[in-house]
């Protein structure tokens, strides 16, 4: 299976069925925390939920539509990062991610996003990387700003997060801008 070493002790691995129990354990333990910025944790209550997610993700990967990876710190699954969409006609990918609360503040997301940006531009010949984050999700927005993304706009009423409608900040990074950093 596909793995990408971010740094010693941190790697990204294409999702596989063996990760389902670890995803379930994290989401069960941190459902309230994750539900602040993600709609799906409220429904992620079984191993079958994650097996289905992994099966869809692998199918979409095979079709060239997305790339979904488990974030592994040491041998422990700590989160998820992906090219949510790979748009060949626009030469653009959208990156999404989430991380267990106990692993926040260690730079794991910033380093992982940076690695996927490199991959998007060098291996996939993309011209743009985009990230969408809830306006109030300051840690996620700081990742974008730290890595040189530009705020391209705010989409109002963008997502219903478990009964709370939120606006999204859309960040973009061009291949040219990345090369200049």
PLM ranges: what are they?
Residues 35-55:
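Conserved GNAT-fold acetyl-CoA-binding loop/helix
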Residues 41, 55-69:
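A short helix-loop-beta-strand connector motif used in the catalytic cores of GNAT acetyltransferases and
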Residues 52, 56, 115-118:
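Generic recognition of well-ordered alpha-helical segments
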Residues 15, 26, 42-49, 63:
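Generic, well-ordered alpha-helical segments
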Residues 1-22, 26-33, 68-181:
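Acyl-donor (CoA/ACP) binding surface of acyl/acetyltransferases
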């Amino acid at each position: 299976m596909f793995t990408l070493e971010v740094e010693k002790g941190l790697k990204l691995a294409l999702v596989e069925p063996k990760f389902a129990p670890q995803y379930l354990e994290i989401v069960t333990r941190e459902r309230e925390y994750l539900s602040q910025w993600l709609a799906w944790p409220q429904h992620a209550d079984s191993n079958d939920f994650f097996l289905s997610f992994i099966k869809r993700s692998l199918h979409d990967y095979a079709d060239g539509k997305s790339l979904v990876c488990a974030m592994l710190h040491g041998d422990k699954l700590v989160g998820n990062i992906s090219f949510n969409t790979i748009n060949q006609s626009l030469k653009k990918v959208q990156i999404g991610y989430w991380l267990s609360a106990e692993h926040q503040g260690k730079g794991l997301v910033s380093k992982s996003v940076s690695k996927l940006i490199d991959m998007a531009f060098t291996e996939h010949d993309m011209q743009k990387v985009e990230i969408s984050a809830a306006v109030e999700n300051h840690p996620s927005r700081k990742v974008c700003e730290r890595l040189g993304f530009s705020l391209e706009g705010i989409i109002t009423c963008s997502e219903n997060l478990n009964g709370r409608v939120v606006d999204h900040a859309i960040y973009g990074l061009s291949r040219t801008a990345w090369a200049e950093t």
